[in-house]
Amino acid sequence: MCIRDRYKQDYESIEFSDFFAFVQASSFEPLYLAVTFIFSQVVSFQTFLFLVSVFNGFILYRFCRFFGAGFSGVGAVCFCWTYLATNMATIRFSLSISLVLLAVLCWLEKDKFKSIFYTCLSVGFHSFSLAFMPLLLLSRVELKASMVFLILSGGVVFGLSFSYLLDSGLFSYIPFSEKLLFYSEKSARSGISIGSLFYVALNGFFMICLFRDRFESVLLNLARWSTLILLALQVGMWFLPVFWNRYQVLTVLIQAVYISFNFVRRGFMLETLVLMLISLLVLAKFLLDPAFVSYVPYQNVISEVLGTDRGDGERRFYEALDAHIDRNVK
């Protein structure tokens, strides 16, 4: 929510400055700045959020329909795992993810020109979209089980090399090198959490299930590649969780589409129930743990429902934000 609050401040400040002054004062990507400037002239920030949600929802619906998956099931999984933390917190990243989904669809349809076009648009909203290029290029290459260990080993080698180059200062010429160093030092102080280890184990188990599936399809191959790349990042880039946390947003979408299509269509009721319980536990952790600042407004609602005094919600949000910052500094 601290990022979202910054979005709101930038959005509302445009009316007091021209476009070029706004661009110079902001560090966001150019295409997002252009879209923000255009919409700020005609609609309020809340309306802009609504339009972003409608656009993202429509693209997700189209992605589900392409593979014949149920939209409601996919939406439920994404809501528990990623929606509140991306669409409601990092607006430009959510738009970027939607454009990456369009790029993947066009690539699978062998329309390379449109795929490259949507990829360029996604980078214009968030530069991290470049990290999804390997998945895009490999999505039509059949993934064999014999390649898994090799790719995971490559992830470890890449992670160790990246860590060495980062610590040695060889990445200092990169514009966001300070941010990379900040996130890696922050992770080193906090260590690896039990939740992160559980998530790695869960993805490993899901990877095994994907290779046990004998009904080969484009969706299955895409789910295998996205899960494997996420695992390689989790194992190799453990010191930079912000990297694989962003990557998992797309992976969760693809996994949700696969699960919605296969678990429900094939009648895997027990597996579906287990997934539902795990997803609800993940959502409960986000809603109840004060460390997740982006969920403070929803935590306020829960407090009110439980009968406590609602008080000043905005004041409580900034108190939670200050506590979160102090916790990271320590």
Features from the language model and the residues they span:
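Alpha-helical transmembrane segments and terminal signal-anchor/GPI-anchor hydrophobic tails
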Residues: 7-20, 136-252, 290-310
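Transmembrane-helix signature of polytopic, membrane-embedded enzymes
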Residues: 61-81
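Short acidic/glycine- and proline-prone juxtamembrane loop motifs at membrane-interface regions
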Residues: 88-94
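Transmembrane helical bundles and short interhelical boundary loops of multi-pass, membrane-embedded
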Residues: 226, 254, 274-330
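Short, small-residue-biased leader/transition segments that mark boundaries at the very start
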Residues: 1-3
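Loop-to-helix entry region of an early transmembrane alpha helix in multi-pass inner-membrane enzymes
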Residues: 30, 41-58
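Membrane-interface transmembrane helices that cradle and orient dolichyl/undecaprenyl
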Residues: 100-114
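Short hydrophobic/aromatic helix or loop-helix immediately within or flanking a transmembrane segment
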Residues: 7-43
